[in-house]
Amino acid sequence: MEKDLTKGNPLGLILRFAIPMFIGNCFQQLYNMVDTVIVGRFVGDRALAAVGSVGTIFFLVVGASNGMAIGFTILTSQRFGAGDADGTRRSVANGILLSACTALVMSLISLSLMRPLLAAMHTPAEILGDAYAYISVICGGLACTLFYNLMASLLRAVGNSRVPLYFLIFSSCLNVGLDLTFILCFHLGTRGAALATVLSQGVSALLCIIYIYGKVPVLRPEASMFRPDPAFSREQLRSALPMALIYAITASGTIIMQSAVNLFGAVAVAGYTAASKIHMLLTQGYFSLGQAMSAYAGQNFGGGDFARIRKGVGAAVLILAAYTVLSFTLSNTLLPVLLPFFFDPGTDLSLFSGWAETYIRINTAFYIFLGTIFVFRSVIQGVGRAGTALAVGFAELTGRIFMARASMRAGSYRMAASADGAAWLCGALTALFLYFLVMRGLEKGAGEKKGDQSAWQDPDRDRN
């Protein structure tokens, strides 16, 4: 069911819209975590380190494709908010064509550059083969990931966050079954874990397509619309490319951070990998809130209601503050509970726990800044200023590179673990500044336009 985010109480609307996405994103992280857990327990701690060592590349490739998919649907959200059904359907058709081209190009480029990149990241020799086997399958199956993200984003653009959740839950369960089948029955190791992820996301994409064509007519383009539209392409790429670049910029910094962690050896990489999976689970609330704010801002921008956007931001800040307290509390209980699941029962956890605890404890202190980035950057993107939001990514990159390089010089894992926090602090300050700058410019422009229209409609006003 489509949801109009231009009417009703912003706090309640954003919460009801974000919660299904939060559950879905948690499931997505859980089935990524299941890959890691099954690999660690049934293949070994070296295989666990191998999967973890390419986590930043996974984020780069999959994150960039996700950014493209979300960017393609910002125009859909705006057209839907403006009540333009024909424009909504045309944006869907053009987004599908652009996504197909994106998947092909990104798969070819990533596969051709993978081995040199792994070498440049100082990937330990004993895990290099397993690392390449895993990430090459992920990159080769990028079309499945991109089209799932596109279809789910299209549904969210019209206010439907529940259906993608249902399909994702099914896909998560399928992923677990395929993981066990490929690893235990066919002995495919890390390659099998990646194959399970790709196939599961492909099933989710297919289910979303079937649902859209059967139940959501506003997103169902006519066959004649599947022709490249230069005007729509320019508008969609103007949003999508900066969003993909934001992921790429962020991932570039995390690749440098991963390179710093790799210098401490396979044991440190395994401990860091387990901690980073728990961290990703804890931070899904921020990511989901950002997704909700992008759709909320997009619809209200399409409707021309800037005051309502500001009210929504105020509501999002309240949600952000409450979730930060919750995630900080959970971090102290989840780590000792979940850490043993990543390793074989006979493994001496004391070898890995110190590395994991250091990363989690440092980063939870900076979660408030991470949440700030997601809220304010998403609003900037939702109002069609994705290019401006690139500055947030560059600020994060600067903070992350500075701290990662400092850790390499000092030989300090604690400094390497602080690189994310430094990035979030820099990014949050930049996002806040840009939000106020963008909103002031939009409101000023809207006021001037309204004044011009009033003058045109009242030619006798100067006589009085």
Task: Identify what each model region corresponds to.
Residues L48-L108, T145-P164, G271-L335, L370-V392, ...:
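Small-residue-rich hydrophobic transmembrane alpha-helices
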Residues A69, I138-R156, P164-S172, A193-L206, ...:
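Short runs within selected transmembrane alpha-helices of multi-pass transporters and secretion channels
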Residues M21, N25, V37, I74, ...:
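Transmembrane alpha-helix boundary and packing residues in multipass membrane permease domains
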Residues V39-F59, A125-D130, T190-R191, F232-S239, ...:
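Interfacial/gating helices of multi-pass transporter permease domains
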Residues L5-V43, T56-G71, L75, A100-S107, ...:
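N-terminal transmembrane alpha-helices
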Residues L30-L48, L118-A125, T181-L188, A248-L281, ...:
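Helix-terminus/linker motif at the lipid-water interface of multi-pass membrane proteins
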Residues R16-D35, V137, Y148, S171, ...:
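Transmembrane helical elements of multi-pass membrane transporters/channels
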Residues M1-A18, T76-G141, C185-L241, A297-A365, ...:
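Short alpha-helical transmembrane segments in multi-pass integral membrane proteins
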